[in-house]
Amino acid sequence: MLRSNVSRIDPKRRNVLDHRKKQFAEAAYKDTDYPHRLNFYSTPPTADITIEQFEQWAIDRLRILAELEACSFRNKTPAETASHMKPLLDKYLPLDTNSSSSSQLFAQRQKDHYSHFILRLAFASTEDLRRRFTRVETMLFRMRLNADDGRERAAFINSLNLDWETVSDEEKRELAAELAATASFGGYKKGQQQQQQYEEDQQTWCKVSWLRVPELVEQRRVFLRQGYAYVPAREQQAMVVSEFSSRLERQLELTARALPRLDEDDRLTPILAHLSKNFITPDASYVGTSSAISSADISARNIDTLVNNHHFPACMSHLHRTLRRDAHLKHYGRLQYTLFLKGIGLNLEECLLFWRQSFNKITDDTFNKEYRYNVRHTYGDVGGDSNRRGGGYSPYSCQKILTEHPPGPGEAHGCPYRHFNMENLQTLLQQGMGVTDRGVLNGVKEDKEKQKFHMACNRVFEHLHKEELKKAKDEGIMTAAQLETIVHPNEYFKRSYLLKNMGKMQGDVKMEG
């Protein structure tokens, strides 16, 4: 009989290994070079960086993305956005061209590379974060692509190995008339720049399946033949941006599926959680009562007066009037309105008094059992340590109101400019806010149809405060920066209150820019 070898591994137990360690046991570490200013972020970085770099680089990129999102909310044009973002990019996320011969090229591109992937980890967890991250990263990529040197841009696009086929000179000669007609349909105006663009189009055409460029087909900006779309140079940048966006969407989904299996460093988890929670626009970061006006009298007894003086935006005016009519609001309506009142400076004691007086069809016992705790929780008076330390919840921004928890039957929360039909919206504006000017109402209708809900709200604000705005501009009380598009209900209140009380509170009106 043969003796068994006691040192031999039991075959049944041979593969019982930690799958996480096995998964990453043979990671391929390699140095990354950055031949191009732009990046499709196809390859994750593998070199070591410090925990301080990890956090600071992510925060710097987050500043850029948040400000880009704010520009889109204010409906700035691409040129206005580029002008606004240039000093911020130079400060937080500079990217010099190869022709600049800067000694900082590698460091700049490494920071850009790493910061993208750090935020990708932070924002892959939910569909909403993935969608927002893709949108603002695409905005950043488009802006950089448009600003890139022509030769460097062409070299970068060629390096991507996109599934394009360059149209040969022979084929261009064969289709010269059709391609010329397509180019002229795009609309060239006289001028040196337009002539250069026309000549460039004549030199560089590519063809792809028409299914990849349905927007260009719809706009008749390409020539179609045998299932292929012939795309001129001026439209190829749009195709690159579209490819960047679609790839990033797919990669974020893969990242989301991998998150539960990642053996993350315990030091990184709280950083990633903090980054995702703070992915908000600078104008939307109202924490606690930071939007409150110190000298304003905000109490339960004068909320009706503030509403009647048109200091509340349409969303909050509708919630208030619904509350007064029904003596009740459903959960999301109570939450949205409570946080707004908290943000304008209504303290917890007064807020509890306001809700108790408003819910006048129920007993004290019912109110204390069903509603009192929730109000205290939003103020950070009860709940876990983190809730109390953080002062409870922050007031909702326009973006949050527009994108989260759309109202259902019997609910009054949300944004009237988005969630109301036009008839109900006009009734609210006319009867609830005193907007009767036909031109303003028609403008609101056009804004709503174009889904420019922020513009509709600001149009109403400017109409209701036109005299005060003129005085503030004429006397230099507020700068242009302080009068930019409102993207937060609490900013609406603050600006309205200060404008209506300019003569009484000059100190408060001089807001920080």
From Swiss-Prot:
Alphabetized InterPro entries for the sequence? DNA_primase_lsu_euk (IPR016558), DNA_primase_lsu_euk/arc (IPR007238)
Q: Which cofactor does it need?
A: [4Fe-4S] cluster
Record keyword Chaperone present = no
Q: Which GO terms describe its biological process?
A: DNA replication initiation; DNA replication, synthesis of primer; double-strand break repair
Cofactor comment text: Binds 1 [4Fe-4S] cluster.
Which GO cellular component terms are attached?
A: alpha DNA polymerase:primase complex; nuclear envelope
Q: Where does [4Fe-4S] cluster bind?
A: 315, 398, 415, 457
Q: Which Pfam families does the entry mention?
A: DNA_primase_lrg (PF04104)
Task: Give the record's keywords alphabetically.
Answer: 4Fe-4S, DNA replication, DNA-binding, Iron, Iron-sulfur, Metal-binding, Primosome
Q: Name one GO molecular function term.
A: single-stranded DNA binding
Tell me which family the UniProt entry assigns to this protein. Belongs to the eukaryotic-type primase large subunit family.
Q: How does it assemble?
A: Heterodimer of a small subunit and a large subunit.
Q: In UniProt terms, what function does this protein have?
A: DNA primase is the polymerase that synthesizes small RNA primers for the Okazaki fragments made during discontinuous DNA replication.
Q: What is this protein called?
A: Probable DNA primase large subunit
Say which species the protein is native to: Neurospora crassa (strain ATCC 24698 / 74-OR23-1A / CBS 708.71 / DSM 1257 / FGSC 987)
